[in-house]
């Protein structure tokens, strides 16, 4: 079980690909290792299913908590459903792999990547993507690879290849680039308002490293004596005759529909459906032994698929040769835009409605307390999430009916992209300590709903009074490539996404890019073409941003009356235990007395949440009193809180008490404490002593009462005593 290992070094870090040792019954397998991170990737192919018209590819990413030396916290102590992070990595594998399989393939394909060991310095996702390509090649599956992926970070002015988790958090860029020998096939990025030139340079930097990993895969195949299987479409004479028949009988009528630029999407779809129905009737009237009729009768979907292929061809020709899109727009023109803020009652903390053409997204923003942060129950060692973006895509948004189920991979992916786009402009936690949740409801979809979610989120957050550093907008770019002819499309709609070769989403502020996501339907593009798309997206983004700012030009200065009020301040971390008290009694008493919610971080940051600002301030005074250091000799005016036979307790600061011994109540002898003071009395005391246990001993002797002497500390606002 020795296997074969190929190693490659990047910036002093070695990546190892081991084949022929693990999972011998899988079609192909490879162990990808870097540092102490190890990911086993397998690819398996089984017999195709009858009657399907798509590639049945499944990509899974599995996390095992033993990889980080942990035991699951569930009742069964076993991993449950994949966490969101695993879903996103599965999509990261799928997106560059899917376009590299032949369009005619109908065999079931499954790629499974399992993280067996995780080094916090080496993220596992890009290893899994590269491993998917290697395993597929070893399985002798028709595949237009090799393909590889790397991550690029930016620390200061230097690009870093495959940075650690900490370097990603500290840097201004988190970019994943996947490519083939033909060019870049996938890009995923989050950036801190980075200039376009820097992002393009990073993509070029990453693609150079991708080429090295591609060579390593080719070397493994050569050393193992495995010849890569080249995709060769099966010859189906009947389908060829059907294509010829449709081209002869339908091209003119389809072309006329595509040139009716003023029609709506529904009208265009209806006319195309009518042409297809009429064609089906004509085919049904042909002789029974006619090859075209036999082809359609043999497979109910073959007519629909060939009709779509012809429509795609004609639409692409119209764009390439005439520069005309199906709705009459120029190649760089954005659809009509409308936006509004505050469209829902203020019980919703913030709301925004964004519409571009037929794409309409309603976003809402909710402000929560630090305890609402999401704990990440996965292998990723990152902190709690304090900004959440959830994306919903109901069936009515495309005029369809289907059961409403929990969010799928697409919803998770689109929500993550919109989340990435907004995070760089969120206010610092110490000045705005709220946990934020944005939900984007897609009310109507005709292309680029994820970028519509970004725009709607900006409107909702500004309406909620979140002081964003800058507003963010986004646009989706498309591409049509026919041989050497390339046309880049701005703000693609649904049919252009479906029939085009690229879906490139670009989000950012007027100063720079915050998120990118590029998916291809071809085997790769040169970086130069990607740069053209990024540059063409900027005027569109700025135009969209200007339209959004017409609805709300700055964050609101007040929060919704139904949003919680937060106070945040810092205390000495060594005094956290004083605030919490034995068994949590002190902090529980403060929250019950003031009707507030209090969170304390390990670093000493205290956050108080309440719907009543005065109550939050009262809780703050108590905590500041508990943590304020007092000194012997200081004079305070306080309230008698309780009396015992040997003395009286005085609250000298909110939450901080000292005791006056009976002998310190007066210069004369005192028989009973309540002969001198009673509960509720206001007295001026001096700190006589602080013992080695921190107990404060007070005295009334020699201390003028009734404000006859200047106090070293102003009298605190009276509050009820702690239990």
Curated annotation (Swiss-Prot):
Per the UniProt entry, the signal peptide is: none
List the SUPFAM superfamilies hit by this protein, alphabetically: Eukaryotic type KH-domain (KH-domain type I), Nucleic acid-binding proteins, Ribonuclease PH domain 2-like, Ribosomal protein S5 domain 2-like
Against CDD domains, the record matches this protein to: KH-I_PNPase (cd02393), RNase_PH_PNPase_1 (cd11363), RNase_PH_PNPase_2 (cd11364)
Task: Give the record's GO biological process terms.
Answer: mRNA catabolic process; RNA processing
Enumerate the subcellular locations listed in this protein's record, separating them with semicolons.
Cytoplasm
Positions binding Mg(2+) in this chain are 497, 503
Cofactor requirements of the protein = Mg(2+)
- GO cellular component terms listed in the entry, alphabetical order: cytosol
* Reaction catalysed by this enzyme: RNA(n+1) + phosphate = RNA(n) + a ribonucleoside 5'-diphosphate
InterPro entries according to UniProt? ExoRNase_PH_dom1, ExoRNase_PH_dom2, ExoRNase_PH_dom2_sf, KH_dom, KH_dom_type_1, KH_dom_type_1_sf, NA-bd_OB-fold, PNPase
**Positions of the UniProt region annotated as Disordered:** 701-723
* Key words of the record: Cytoplasm, Magnesium, Metal-binding, Nucleotidyltransferase, RNA-binding, Transferase
Q: Which Gene3D superfamilies does the UniProt record give?
A: GHMP Kinase, N-terminal domain, K Homology domain, type 1, Nucleic acid-binding proteins
Molecular functions per Gene Ontology: 3'-5'-RNA exonuclease activity; magnesium ion binding; polyribonucleotide nucleotidyltransferase activity; RNA binding
KH domain residues are: 564-623
The protein's enzyme class? transferase
Domain (S1 motif) spans 633-701
Q: Which family does it belong to?
A: Belongs to the polyribonucleotide nucleotidyltransferase family.
PANTHER family documented for this protein: POLYRIBONUCLEOTIDE NUCLEOTIDYLTRANSFERASE, POLYRIBONUCLEOTIDE NUCLEOTIDYLTRANSFERASE 1, MITOCHONDRIAL
Briefly state the protein's biological role. Answer: Involved in mRNA degradation. Catalyzes the phosphorolysis of single-stranded polyribonucleotides processively in the 3'- to 5'-direction.
Protein name (Swiss-Prot/TrEMBL): Polyribonucleotide nucleotidyltransferase
Report which gene this protein is encoded by: pnp
